[in-house]
Amino acid sequence: MLSESIAKLVQYGVETGLIPECERNYTTNLLLDVFYEDDYTAPEQEFQNIELEKVLAELLKEAIDRGLIEDSVVYKDLFDTRLMNCLMPRPAEVQTTFWKKYGENPKAATDYFYKLSQDSNYIRRYRVKKDQKWTVDSEYGKLDITINLSKPEKDPKAIAAARNVKSGSYPKCLLCPENEGYAGRVNHPARQNHRIIPITINDSPWGFQYSPYVYYNEHCIVFNSYHTPMKIERNTFVKLFDFVKLFPHYFLGSNADLPIVGGSILSHDHFQGGHYTFAMANAPIEKHVTIPGFEDVEAGIVKWPLSVLRIRHKNPERLIDLATHVLQAWRGYTDEAAFVFANTDGEPHNTITPIARKVGDVYELDLTLRNNITTKEHPLGVYHPHAQYHHIKKENIGLIEVMGLAVLPARLKEELELLEEYILSGKDISSNEKIAKHEDWVKELLEKYPDINAENIHAILQKEVGLVFVHVLEDAGVYKCTPKGREDFMRFVDSL
């Protein structure tokens, strides 16, 4: 059985191009060693069109039966990554192939690297497929909604084991280049099948990789080779455009550098990008503006729930200069009438979420104005999802959400299924603690849709979840899409 499963995995490596035909024996022997096995019988039958998930499941069962690992998703992930490492080309080979293909054209290089990142099981295709995805029409365009199910839920045993492991300081975080080839531990994922392409932006060493959880097509991460904290400054804009010049078919954006309005990792300077057009990129300029000293730069307020100033020019240097001017002005800007305070008690509040892209021969930069002030009424943030929407989304509104993609928690899959069941059978929603938090929302829905039934309930819930996301984005907008909000926004623009 083991020999057969190993033969299948090796065949998968040959079929996908991870290994050449001449490395068949070598790879077989590496895999035998992982199982502490010194005997092998080549199967008589030939295997084709191998399904990776099935073969790995066979090999994981074998490892559990032999007592090599515990039957838990954490240990299984560590082990199957070790198996995939036996099929992986070395980093130098990946880099050489990447830049050779880049010589043909940048897209050929990223196509190769994205396929490798999936074939290697670094991106687990069969898990990403489980994510629930749909779109919702809104006044701001077609928004993307996803319930993220590709991050596996840790089981209680693994959580307990992780508690007992003293937290290591190597690698310093999940974005450090030292992750490449790392075997992992209970509280840190294995990254033996992970490859990084070194790139130079702003004359400094950075790394280019894909996100293992791909929230959208070719979701990439670009990170500083050194563990330095996030900081939005002039150099941020230089780096964004250096990358877009290298890969003009990709956009690249940065999370803000302050808590509440920033991303989940503020400790390591990084950007996120990819080959995808978000609703925000399609959103039109609602009001064109001219900024003194930058009359040659097309600028305007975008029709978008967050407060976005879009600037466009064929020369990215002009955009870098203007973005720096806007950033410096916003950092120090206070307008009490609009409830915008640059700082309170010495704590800064104003920052920017920038997104760079190239459209035809024109460079474009979206500057999203952010503010992380809190009040007694809104202790998690005034410009953050308000409490009435926390039953759907209470996490930070980071770069991905800013662009129009809701990344919703996995709990919603079960909760929405339960809601369908309870609504159709007329059961009391407050009687189930898993869904009691949705009670007020459901009351509103029942008034809005008196003819809700088994045929339409699924579509109705999906649509209404999407509309909650719209409200959440509006909450995160410093200047609201109202006459007063636009007037307040123009006061800032006029101050430039």
Placement of each model-derived feature along the sequence:
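Active-site microenvironments that recognize anionic phosphate/pyrophosphate groups
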Residues: M1-V222, Y226-P229, K303-P305, L319-A323, ...
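Helical scaffold of the NTase/Pol beta-like nucleotidyltransferase catalytic core
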Residues: N193-R195, H227-L252
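Structured alpha-helical segments in the cores of large, soluble enzyme domains
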Residues: W206-S211, T236, L240-V244, T290-V297
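Catalytic or ion-translocation cores adjacent to nucleophile or general acid/base/metal-coordination motifs
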Residues: V244, P248-S267, G273-L327, R331-T334
